[in-house]
From Swiss-Prot:
GO cellular component terms, semicolon-separated: chloroplast; mitochondrial large ribosomal subunit
Family (UniProt): Belongs to the universal ribosomal protein uL2 family.
GO biological process, one term: mitochondrial translation
Cell compartments where the protein resides: Plastid, Chloroplast
Naturally occurring in which organism (per UniProt): Porphyra purpurea (Red seaweed)
A molecular-function term among this protein's GO annotations: structural constituent of ribosome
Subunit structure of this chain's protein: Part of the 50S ribosomal subunit.
PROSITE patterns linked: RIBOSOMAL_L2
Record gene name: rpl2
Stretches the record annotates as Disordered: 224-249
A family per Pfam: Ribosomal_L2
Keyword Ribosomal protein: yes
Protein name: Large ribosomal subunit protein uL2c
Amino acid sequence: MAIRLYRAYTPGTRNRTVSTFSEITTDKPEKSLINKHHFCKGRNNRGVITCRHKGGGHKQRYRLIDFKRNRHNIIAKVASIEYDPNRNARIALLHYLDGEKRYILHPRSLSVGAIVVSGPMAPIEVGNALPLSTIPLGTAVHNIELRPYCGGQIVRSAGTYAQIVAKEGNFVTVKLPSSEVRMIRKECYATIGQVGNIDASNITLGKAGRSRWLGKRPTVRGVVMNPVDHPHGGGGEGKSPIGRSRPVTPWGKPALGVKTRNPNKYSNPYVLLVVNKVYLTYNLILKYNVEINT
């Protein structure tokens, strides 16, 4: 993927960058694999805002992506590489030998005409899906399942990949793009390779309207609101301090650096290295005999 730059002939193009879409081979999606996409605009069934800064945006049709890769031992051919408005990664259309068609996330360097397959005996090649237990150490993978046969849930964004670090017992240790290290069941499937469109993070929107096309509404600072709208609001003329010892959320809870993960979450024992605070858990100390200077 290449990035196209614009000259500053208008304020909106001064810092604007877009993709050249050079890897896209067709602009018509497979009709049998698209559905209507209903936008909730950040509201629940009562119309109450449950997620701020969402709403509007261009109409989109949802592409049905095969995250499970459960058509084992059936060879498929990459028919086209397409744009998906619902994600920053590209998608690849597969034609199976039995006539079925499915979309998958497009891995980097996978081209039209390539052959992919999923299953325990699949070769270690880009685009193939295998159980973690059969993937060699150090291999880059994406679209990883957290529970067997439930479909890939992590490492699906453009340009991301995880790395197989170790294998022990019924678990495989994986290093995620955030540098978090966690254990995953060895029966879980993952796809070989790195997700394509690696320059997606380098795109600059350039103007507010482009954010609105994506369905992103403005983010307003609490300090410029009224007291009825935010704990930071109010204060008279000009700029005023928030009047608190630390910043808080619109609902009065501490913000900036407060942990939000449930301390009793079932998967906590499987997370070996937490990056947010960069500390090693007791499980990692026992497993790798790591000494920490306190």
